[in-house]
Amino acid sequence: MTKVELAKLRTMIPEMRRVRRIHFIGIGGAGMGGIAEVLANEGYQVTGSDLARNAVTERLASLGAHIFVGHSAEHVSEASVVVVSTAIKQDNPELLAARELRIPVVRRAEMLAELMRFRHGIAIAGTHGKTTTTSLVASIYAEADRDPTFVIGGLLNSAGTNARLGSSRYLIAEADESDASFLHLQPMVSIVTNIEADHMETYGGDFSKLKATFIDFLHNLPFYGLAVVCVDDPVIRGMLPEIARPTITYGLSDDADVQVLDFVQTSNRSCFRVRRKDAGELAVTLNLPGIHNALNAAAAIAVATEDGIGDDAIICALAKFEGVGRRFQQYGEFETGRGKAMLVDDYGHHPSEVKVTINAARTGWPDKRLVMVFQPHRYTRTRDLYEDFSDVLSKVDVLVMLEVYAAGEEPIPGADGRALCRSIRSRGSLEPIFAATPDDVPAILADLIGEGDLVLTQGAGNVGALSRRLGEMKLSIDSMKSGA
């Protein structure tokens, strides 16, 4: 992209000409890093700090961002504005310094809202499926030569990044309900995939407040905007009479405006028909497993069809979709020394997400023994969904349970990995194996895996790094025993 094109894009946020340097506290997260990348490509000076370097910070550094390891008050001294992630605590030295220096402090969603303000925003919200649905929408728009800007909460494999600055008016982004900050967004189109109890501490434990917040999010649309919602979800179906915006529904239900029919999965690929209320039927091949991903594709199809994107671009984008990092990411099938075993990694950390991942594995590879390495994420979530976790985790063949990934929370008695193991064991169908740390897992797996196994690492914490390590070991029993 030329400097002239970049200068033109800068005029889309004219009042931000006063801004010279933007500092991100917690820049290594996918959501924060994505916004930082777009701003860096727009020509702003971007700095940021995090506790450690990772792939996100390395990419940003390659784009000219200055990355600090660790947090220090001096890092914000030259900043025009400071952006904070939800993970940053109030006693963070950079946050305290910014406030003392009267530097504006905004949340991630507020900065995303500024990027979206003068663009045609497409925002994807929901408890599950946001990242994949956002990726599918972005892929279709790219295939149709709409050249969108996108900000995704995971790595879009085909682009090699989770964010990109496009030259068109389109901005496609995830909308995060975890802290209700998605209410800052003013999109033209909003997708809501589903609504379940999660992040309830934000909503005072009141599910009706969570539902009301999603309705407020949809009512941030202009009166001529578009809400695209999954009618299969009972909460969304119940909310429909309260949504006072133009609405398109999608789902498996017969009354859906965009309906998924005749779903068939073979290994990693899914085939199905899509009946559209005001357009022709589509025969779709999706390069993703699981009927839940067919529904995610239906949402993307609904948006693209409404925006006049041709069927050829839709069909082509879905057929060649290369997936998203840590969303049923397949590392391959390896000769372990005791037969071949397959390694898959998935980010899902809510019982409903774990359930659909298990179903996708069972449907695509019905003859394989399912060996899951599960890492619970947050003590509050483990406590609030304890029975649901116990039920769904009982459905695998072999379970290795890690300790809860705290994500900054304090431990809660009775809501940890050992307690979950006891609960699952009491159901009588499975004998879980507890692993105190991820470093203990390779040796445990070396004694477990055999011919035809599907090893599935599951969770939102550092279990993803464990999966990469297992992939580097190629699930070799000798390598896992030695830790090499």
Curated annotation (Swiss-Prot):
Organism: Aeromonas salmonicida (strain A449)
Catalysis: reaction(s): UDP-N-acetyl-alpha-D-muramate + L-alanine + ATP = UDP-N-acetyl-alpha-D-muramoyl-L-alanine + ADP + phosphate + H(+)
Domain of life of the organism encoding this protein: Bacteria
InterPro entries membership: Mur-like_cat_sf, Mur_ligase_C, Mur_ligase_C_dom_sf, Mur_ligase_cen, Mur_ligase_N, MurCDEF_pg_biosynth, UDP-N-AcMur_Ala_ligase_MurC
Biological or metabolic pathway of the protein: Cell wall biogenesis; peptidoglycan biosynthesis
Function of the molecule: Cell wall formation.
Record flagged with keyword Transcription regulation: no
UniProt EC number: 6.3.2.8
Gene3D superfamilies recorded: Mur ligase, C-terminal domain, Mur-like, catalytic domain, NAD(P)-binding Rossmann-like Domain
Sites where the protein binds ATP: G126, T127, H128, G129, K130, T131, T132
A Pfam family matched in the record: Mur_ligase
GO molecular function: ATP binding; UDP-N-acetylmuramate-L-alanine ligase activity
Entry keywords, A to Z: ATP-binding, Cell cycle, Cell division, Cell shape, Cell wall biogenesis/degradation, Cytoplasm, Ligase, Nucleotide-binding, Peptidoglycan synthesis
Major enzyme class: ligase
Gene Ontology biological process terms from the UniProt entry: cell division; cell wall organization; peptidoglycan biosynthetic process; regulation of cell shape
PANTHER family associated with the record: UDP-N-ACETYLMURAMATE--L-ALANINE LIGASE, UDP-N-ACETYLMURAMATE--L-ALANINE LIGASE-RELATED
Main location: cytoplasm
This protein's record includes keyword Ligase: yes
GO CC field: cytoplasm
Intracellular or extracellular location(s): Cytoplasm
Similarity comment: family membership: Belongs to the MurCDEF family.
Name the record gives this protein: UDP-N-acetylmuramate--L-alanine ligase
